[in-house]
């Protein structure tokens, strides 16, 4: 069965629109260099509005320390975290929430991430 994730949610209207059409996951980007970055307080407010929907909330992180990921996930009310950096398996294991690991399909080396202790994996096109 296919699952749909809409990432880069930055406002309540978009989040509610996703929930109303039964999107499976929505993503909040907590990487400050992203144009779709969202403040943790705004993400928390959106997640509180979504409490009566079955949609899963995902926090997207890039090379963040596990303690901060755990803190944000707990505060915001995330169901998953999605990791887009060069996290080692040891660091990934310190994260106390369901994990999605993203890897680049630029080379066969990206497949090494399948050895991580994650529930789901996703692949991205390589940045040029």
PLM features: what roles do these ranges have?
Residues 9-17, 64-72, 110-117:
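Short, acidic/polar
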Residues 34-46, 85-97, 110-111:
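Active-site-adjacent beta->alpha loops and helix N-cap segments on the catalytic face
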Residues 18, 81:
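Conserved, mostly hydrophobic/aromatic
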Residues 21, 75-76:
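Structural motif
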Residues 6-11, 60-64, 84-86, 103-106:
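Glycine-rich beta-to-alpha transition loops that act as phosphate-gripper elements at the mouths
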Residues 121-128:
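Conserved small/polar residues in nucleotide/adenosyl-binding loops
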Residues 1-4, 52-59, 96-104:
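Short beta-strand/loop segments at the ligand-binding rim of alpha/beta enzyme cores
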């Amino acid at each position: 069965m296919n699952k749909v994730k809409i990432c880069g949610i930055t406002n309540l209207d978009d989040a509610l629109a996703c929930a109303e059409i039964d999107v499976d996951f929505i993503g909040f980007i907590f990487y400050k260099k992203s144009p779709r970055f969202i403040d943790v307080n705004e993400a928390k407010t959106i997640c509180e509005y979504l409490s009566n929907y079955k949609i899963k909330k995902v926090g997207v992180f890039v090379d963040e320390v596990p303690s901060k990921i755990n803190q944000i996930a707990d505060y915001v009310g995330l169901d998953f975290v999605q990791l887009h950096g060069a996290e080692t398996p040891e660091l990934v294991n310190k994260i106390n929430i369901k994990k999605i690991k993203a890897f680049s399909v630029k080379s066969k080396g990206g497949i090494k991430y399948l050895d991580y202790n994650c529930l789901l994996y996703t692949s991205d096109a390589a940045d040029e």
